[in-house]
């Protein structure tokens, strides 16, 4: 994974260049994260997409059936497999902001099997890795392992999180969006 040396393929739009509705998203992101991620500065070129993605990510990565910090670590792990330094950095920061420890963040980026995770959390990371290779790897045998430790809502969130972070790093890398400072 290497950072971007070149300019983004689509310009980053600053707050004074966007509609009031998108400015509201920028304000919410700034309040929540302390920064407006560069991905949103590119998505702002298509307001309906920026609004939809913001709503999707808020509902996906917030505390729900699974804790937000864990879903951010899943996003970090998948982003690492996608070789997206931007997404690894962004989701490591979000995991930290939502309560993940530095040891957990480091383990999610490395040997999670030896990390400070429950067996269920390790199984979730294995699920993300299998899904990354092929959805067919979530076969009946593996799915029965998930069902043994996760509720249906948790399984849906786990798979949706892992699947979503197959998309976002690809978007970022294809458009050469620079890592948010």
Locate the predicted segments by residue.
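Hydrophobic alpha-helical segments
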Residues: 1-181
């Amino acid at each position: 994974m290497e950072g971007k040396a070149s300019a983004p393929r689509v310009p980053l739009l600053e707050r004074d260049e966007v509609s009031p509705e998108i400015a509201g998203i920028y304000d919410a992101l700034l309040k929540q994260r302390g920064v407006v991620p560069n991905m949103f500065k590119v998505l702002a070129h298509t307001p309906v997409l920026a609004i939809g993605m913001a709503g999707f990510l808020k509902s996906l990565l917030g505390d729900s059936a699974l804790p937000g910090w864990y879903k951010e670590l899943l996003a970090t792990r998948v982003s690492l497999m996608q070789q997206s330094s931007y997404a690894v950095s962004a989701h490591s920061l979000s995991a930290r902001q939502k309560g993940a420890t530095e040891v957990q963040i480091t383990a999610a980026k490395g040997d999670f099997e030896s990390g400070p995770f429950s067996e269920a959390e390790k199984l979730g990371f294995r699920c993300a890795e299998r899904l990354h290779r092929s959805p067919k790897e979530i076969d009946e045998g593996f799915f029965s392992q998930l069902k043994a430790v996760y509720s249906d809502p948790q399984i849906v969130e786990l798979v949706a999180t892992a699947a979503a972070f197959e998309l976002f790093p690809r978007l970022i890398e294809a458009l050469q969006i620079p890592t948010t400072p």
